[in-house]
């Protein structure tokens, strides 16, 4: 049996063959979403090359890439799920192997909060035929902070060990090596 719900003479919802359709309306701020629902999503892309020679995370412009995303978190109980697809390479100038590390950090200025350190995310061996070997690294982590409002996440890179190599992000500024980072607010 088909039917409808009216509020002040306006059809709000209708039912037909077991399917309920909400016709009009806006969800208010007191709506509670079931756990696991994605309620916000932001994504950013970057192809600006960055060369890093640091062997430790400096938390500044020497190691933080231009790849960042800001999400306006609504609920303190939500988690933020972060996905990052980063084009990374290690330039060893033909001198064997090298390893690049990456981490996701939160903040707009120092001190930053580390969300996840992906140690040794790209390891290369260059026998001398080429000077840089790279890969696309897919990084994923979650932030369980109770903070709300604008949260900004960055990709930071460094070299492993003390080798005098270069860790490179996103290729050659041609736009051919685009990396991305996305943030999702997930209800709990």
State what each model feature region is.
Residues 2-52, 188:
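Glycine-rich, low-complexity segments
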Residues 63-65:
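Short, solvent-exposed loop/turn segments enriched in Ser/Thr/Gly
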Residues 45, 51-61, 70-150, 154-188:
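Terminal beta-strand-rich extracellular "head" domains
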């Amino acid at each position: 049996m088909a039917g409808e719900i009216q509020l002040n003479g306006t059809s709000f919802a209708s039912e037909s063959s077991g399917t309920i359709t909400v016709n009009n309306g806006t969800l208010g701020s007191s709506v509670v979403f079931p756990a696991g629902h994605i309620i916000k999503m932001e994504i950013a892309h970057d192809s600006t090359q960055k060369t890093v020679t640091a062997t430790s995370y400096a938390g500044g412009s020497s190691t933080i890439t231009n790849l960042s995303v800001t999400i306006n978190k609504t609920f303190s109980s939500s988690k933020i799920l972060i996905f990052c697809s980063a084009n990374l390479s290690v330039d060893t100038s033909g001198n064997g192997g090298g390893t690049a590390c990456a981490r996701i950090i939160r903040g707009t200025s120092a001190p930053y909060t580390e969300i996840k350190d992906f140690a040794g995310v790209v390891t290369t061996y260059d026998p001398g035929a080429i000077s840089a070997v790279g890969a696309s690294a897919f990084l994923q982590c979650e932030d369980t902070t109770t903070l709300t409002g604008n949260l900004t996440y960055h990709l930071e890179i460094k070299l492993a060990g003390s080798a005098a190599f270069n860790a490179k992000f996103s290729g050659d500024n041609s736009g051919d090596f685009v990396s991305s980072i996305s943030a999702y607010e997930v209800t709990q």
